[in-house]
Amino acid sequence: MQPIAAPLLQWFDANKRLLPFRQEPSAYHLWVREIMLQQTRVAAAIPYYERFIAALPDPAALAACEPDALRKLWQGLGYYNRVNNMQKAARIVCEQYGGDLPADYDALRSLPGIGDYTAGAVASIAFGIPVPAVDGNVLRVFARLYNDDADVMAPATKKAFTVRVLDQMPKATPGPYNEALMELGALVCIPGTPHCEECPLADLCRGYAAGRADQLPVKPAPKAKGKVPVTVALIESEQGLLLQRRPARGLLAGLWQPAAWEKALTRDELTAALAGIGVQAALDEPLPPAKHVFTHKIWELGGWRGTAPACALPDGYVWAAPEDLAEVYPVPNAFGAYVKAK
């Protein structure tokens, strides 16, 4: 394979998007960007990024942020374990590295929530360290470039492609090279039908030459996701909406939600379950069915809307006033059909 860096970087200089992520290329800004973009499209992430950076401009601010306030900043992005790990990492950065992310790939890689790709992106773009940053975009570009049928989700394939990315890397400009590959995959070498006629690497691309770029990369068939019934109780009192805190570990850890049970309950069973926490509810209206898809399971939601007299609640439950629901309690998108994030 001939060198790809020169035409790639020339294309990147002329075509890269003017994004707020690129206006402040500090290690901290890059880290926040990359964590947000792991499960979120660029256009959707921009307002969250700007709000997050305005509220928490450096690792020290992130480390000190109260957990519910942090989750409220993240509300709408989902996958809350990302921001929980960011706070853990920020505290380590403050304790061990003087409040600045370390200019070392292995040290970055050791921080909670930072994998090979994120460590490579921060190390190369912020610090000019010649290490690859291989995400799904880059895997797709190289599968087509080399006309490679290997399963890109297999660890051995990722390792082999990482070697190829490193072999092509200009050691003087690793950051722009990595960003250019990601940008090419996002704008031109897209999933499904790539825009090969616009690609600066078309003359070098073996997949394009073979007429099969749109058939690559090869991925295994997705596994079927298990379906889990969730019964929701949307209960209002004069003090507000009944909320329940989820467990500190596991799915949606530490977030607030309407009282809910991960099983199918009848109206009478739901009334009894609420009575078990001291809430004497009148269930008046069935909730419309809803669905929320996680990476490994599907919640099938339903339940009842009702009212109850305000009462003392056990630990882990609150009556949330409307203004507190908007400002204090982060409710995950899984319940968005019933509780709208403000």
Language model regions located:
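Intrinsically disordered, low-complexity, charged terminal extensions of DNA damage-control enzymes
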Residues: 1-18, 23, 186-342
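Catalytic cores of DNA base-excision repair glycosylases
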Residues: 2-197, 201-210, 214, 280
